[in-house]
Amino acid sequence: MQNISRAAAIVGVAEADEIGYLENRKSDLQLNEEACYNAIEDAGLNKSDVDGLFAAGNTLGLAEHMGIHPKFTDSTSVGGSSFVIHAGHALAAIAAGYCEVALVTHGMAGHSRRFFEGSRESGAANSPGAQFESPYGFIGAPINYSMACARYMHEFGEDRSREAMAEVAISTAQVGRPQPQSTHPRPKGGDTADHVL
């Protein structure tokens, strides 16, 4: 198998103009578009250079809204890790010659959406999730992550895995907290596995 790890480089990184709890309502599309334009600018490119688009939503709608014409799109959606998977997919697409400049984006108006009455977006009432998952409380990221944790604990043992998962939470918080956009202050109990557990 060919090693493609050096087939591409990340040359631009950016966020939407506002993140966290927004004063004004913005859609997922607006946040994606802002982040895309900011990343393109950070890379020193033009939107016409982009020929690959990777997003966990409607890539064709985003491309149309931005006025770009990608040769390759990927809308794989696996929840909050989609953009991580898209980075790998973008690398593979570039190595295979499907595109030269890949734009990976993720934008979600989750925090700001809560503050606007009647703005809660939901799936169609006849979707499988609405019919067979939501009535039983199977909703959102906590459920999805807990399934992965349960599997990890089954494979590697409950005692060892609880502490390992606490360390992941601690290291994630330590990296994220110093960022200017962080919405999570330092916990009162400190960054210890005992406090997390």
Task: Say what each PLM segment does.
Residues 1-29, 131, 155, 167-171:
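Condensing-enzyme catalytic core mediating Claisen C-C bond formation in acyl metabolism
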Residues 32, 59, 83:
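Conserved donor sugar-nucleotide recognition element shared by glycan-biosynthetic enzymes
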Residues 62-69:
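Glycine-rich loop at the start of a catalytic domain that most often binds anionic cofactors/ligands
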